[in-house]
Amino acid sequence: MSQIKHCKIEEIPAGHKCEHEGYEYFRRKFVPFGEAKNTHVCVYEIPPLKSAYPYHFHYKTEETFYIISGTGILKTPEGERKVSAGELIFFPAGEAGAHKLTNGSETENLVYIDFDVTHDLDVAVYPDSDKIGIWGMGINKIFPMSADVDYYDGE
Protein backbone atom coordinates (compact mmCIF):
# COMPACT_ATOMS: atom_id res chain seq x y z
CA MET A 1 0.00 0.00 0.00
CA SER A 2 1.63 3.22 -1.10
CA GLN A 3 -1.03 5.72 -0.10
CA ILE A 4 -3.01 6.91 2.89
CA LYS A 5 -6.23 4.97 3.42
CA HIS A 6 -9.34 6.51 4.98
CA CYS A 7 -12.94 5.33 5.35
CA LYS A 8 -15.77 4.75 7.80
CA ILE A 9 -16.00 1.28 9.36
CA GLU A 10 -19.44 0.64 7.86
CA GLU A 11 -18.02 1.26 4.36
CA ILE A 12 -15.82 -1.85 4.63
CA PRO A 13 -17.61 -5.07 3.59
CA ALA A 14 -18.01 -7.54 6.45
CA GLY A 15 -17.02 -11.14 5.85
CA HIS A 16 -18.80 -13.72 8.01
CA LYS A 17 -17.25 -16.90 9.42
CA CYS A 18 -19.16 -19.51 11.42
CA GLU A 19 -17.58 -22.94 10.94
CA HIS A 20 -17.51 -24.44 14.44
CA GLU A 21 -19.76 -24.31 17.50
CA GLY A 22 -18.75 -21.50 19.84
CA TYR A 23 -16.84 -19.59 17.16
CA GLU A 24 -18.29 -16.91 14.90
CA TYR A 25 -17.33 -13.45 13.70
CA PHE A 26 -17.90 -10.71 11.18
CA ARG A 27 -14.59 -9.21 10.00
CA ARG A 28 -13.98 -5.96 8.14
CA LYS A 29 -10.48 -5.91 6.64
CA PHE A 30 -9.27 -2.30 6.70
CA VAL A 31 -5.63 -3.23 5.92
CA PRO A 32 -5.73 -6.85 4.67
CA PHE A 33 -2.71 -9.17 4.80
CA GLY A 34 -0.29 -8.30 2.02
CA GLU A 35 -1.60 -4.78 1.43
CA ALA A 36 0.98 -3.19 3.75
CA LYS A 37 4.49 -4.38 4.54
CA ASN A 38 4.06 -5.33 8.22
CA THR A 39 0.57 -4.22 9.21
CA HIS A 40 -2.80 -5.93 9.27
CA VAL A 41 -5.87 -4.12 10.66
CA CYS A 42 -9.38 -5.55 10.97
CA VAL A 43 -12.57 -4.69 12.80
CA TYR A 44 -14.22 -7.72 14.41
CA GLU A 45 -17.82 -8.06 15.51
CA ILE A 46 -18.39 -11.10 17.71
CA PRO A 47 -21.98 -12.30 18.34
CA PRO A 48 -23.14 -13.00 21.91
CA LEU A 49 -21.35 -15.82 23.76
CA LYS A 50 -19.02 -16.54 20.80
CA SER A 51 -15.27 -16.24 20.21
CA ALA A 52 -13.43 -15.39 17.00
CA TYR A 53 -10.51 -17.76 17.59
CA PRO A 54 -9.37 -20.44 20.04
CA TYR A 55 -6.79 -19.72 22.75
CA HIS A 56 -3.48 -19.20 20.93
CA PHE A 57 -0.21 -17.30 20.68
CA HIS A 58 2.00 -16.27 17.78
CA TYR A 59 5.76 -16.67 17.57
CA LYS A 60 6.23 -13.54 15.44
CA THR A 61 3.00 -11.52 15.23
CA GLU A 62 2.20 -8.92 17.87
CA GLU A 63 -1.44 -7.90 18.31
CA THR A 64 -3.23 -4.95 19.89
CA PHE A 65 -7.00 -4.90 20.45
CA TYR A 66 -9.07 -1.76 21.02
CA ILE A 67 -12.55 -2.57 22.35
CA ILE A 68 -15.08 -0.30 20.60
CA SER A 69 -18.26 -1.62 22.22
CA GLY A 70 -19.55 -4.51 24.28
CA THR A 71 -17.93 -6.63 26.96
CA GLY A 72 -15.69 -9.63 26.69
CA ILE A 73 -13.95 -12.30 28.69
CA LEU A 74 -10.23 -12.32 27.98
CA LYS A 75 -8.30 -15.53 28.67
CA THR A 76 -4.51 -15.14 29.04
CA PRO A 77 -1.77 -17.12 30.82
CA GLU A 78 -2.68 -15.12 33.96
CA GLY A 79 -6.32 -16.32 33.89
CA GLU A 80 -9.59 -14.72 32.80
CA ARG A 81 -10.80 -11.15 33.22
CA LYS A 82 -13.53 -8.90 31.87
CA VAL A 83 -12.78 -6.29 29.22
CA SER A 84 -15.04 -3.51 27.97
CA ALA A 85 -15.33 -0.53 25.63
CA GLY A 86 -12.40 1.86 25.67
CA GLU A 87 -9.78 -0.71 26.70
CA LEU A 88 -6.54 -1.32 24.79
CA ILE A 89 -4.90 -4.75 25.12
CA PHE A 90 -1.44 -5.66 23.78
CA PHE A 91 -0.37 -9.26 23.11
CA PRO A 92 3.39 -9.73 22.63
CA ALA A 93 4.74 -12.49 20.43
CA GLY A 94 5.45 -15.72 22.30
CA GLU A 95 3.77 -17.72 25.05
CA ALA A 96 3.28 -14.66 27.27
CA GLY A 97 0.94 -13.24 24.60
CA ALA A 98 -1.46 -16.21 24.52
CA HIS A 99 -5.08 -15.08 24.38
CA LYS A 100 -8.70 -15.83 23.59
CA LEU A 101 -11.42 -13.18 23.58
CA THR A 102 -15.02 -14.29 24.08
CA ASN A 103 -18.11 -12.11 23.95
CA GLY A 104 -19.46 -12.26 27.50
CA SER A 105 -22.87 -10.78 26.70
CA GLU A 106 -26.02 -12.75 25.92
CA THR A 107 -27.54 -9.85 23.96
CA GLU A 108 -24.89 -7.40 22.69
CA ASN A 109 -22.18 -7.86 20.06
CA LEU A 110 -18.54 -7.33 21.03
CA VAL A 111 -16.79 -4.99 18.56
CA TYR A 112 -13.04 -4.40 18.52
CA ILE A 113 -10.19 -3.36 16.25
CA ASP A 114 -7.29 -5.79 15.87
CA PHE A 115 -3.99 -4.11 14.94
CA ASP A 116 -1.32 -6.67 13.99
CA VAL A 117 2.39 -6.27 13.33
CA THR A 118 2.93 -9.06 10.80
CA HIS A 119 5.76 -10.90 9.07
CA ASP A 120 6.13 -12.93 5.87
CA LEU A 121 5.73 -16.15 7.85
CA ASP A 122 4.20 -16.81 11.27
CA VAL A 123 3.65 -19.78 13.54
CA ALA A 124 0.78 -19.95 16.03
CA VAL A 125 0.38 -22.46 18.85
CA TYR A 126 -2.98 -23.57 20.28
CA PRO A 127 -2.18 -24.82 23.82
CA ASP A 128 -5.71 -26.04 24.68
CA SER A 129 -5.98 -28.28 21.60
CA ASP A 130 -2.26 -29.07 21.19
CA LYS A 131 -2.02 -27.78 17.59
CA ILE A 132 0.40 -25.65 15.62
CA GLY A 133 -0.42 -23.42 12.63
CA ILE A 134 1.88 -22.03 9.95
CA TRP A 135 0.84 -19.05 7.78
CA GLY A 136 2.38 -16.92 5.07
CA MET A 137 4.32 -17.25 1.83
CA GLY A 138 1.62 -19.48 0.33
CA ILE A 139 1.36 -21.75 3.38
CA ASN A 140 -1.82 -22.08 5.43
CA LYS A 141 -1.63 -25.28 7.48
CA ILE A 142 -2.57 -26.54 10.94
CA PHE A 143 -1.12 -29.71 12.45
CA PRO A 144 -1.40 -31.60 15.73
CA MET A 145 1.74 -31.05 17.81
CA SER A 146 2.18 -34.84 17.84
CA ALA A 147 2.70 -34.87 14.03
CA ASP A 148 6.44 -35.30 14.37
CA VAL A 149 8.40 -36.91 11.54
CA ASP A 150 12.07 -37.61 10.99
CA TYR A 151 13.92 -34.86 9.12
CA TYR A 152 14.68 -37.25 6.24
CA ASP A 153 11.28 -38.98 6.17
CA GLY A 154 10.14 -39.29 2.54
CA GLU A 155 13.50 -38.25 1.06
Give residue spans per PLM region.
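Short acidic-glycine-tyrosine-enriched beta hairpin
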Residues: P77-G94
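Short hydrophobic/aromatic patches on the structural cores and recognition surfaces of FHA
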Residues: G70, G86, L101
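Short beta-strand segments
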Residues: Y53-Y55, R81, A124
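A short, N-terminal "cap"/entry segment at the start of jelly-roll beta-barrel domains
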Residues: M1-N38, V125-E155
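Short beta->alpha connector loops
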Residues: L49, G72, G94-G97
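Short, conserved beta-strand element in jelly-roll/cupin
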Residues: V43-P47, H58-T76, F115-D116
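Conserved short histidine dyad/triad with adjacent acidic residue
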Residues: F26-K29, C42-H58
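Ligand-binding loop in jelly-roll beta-barrel domains
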Residues: A93-L121
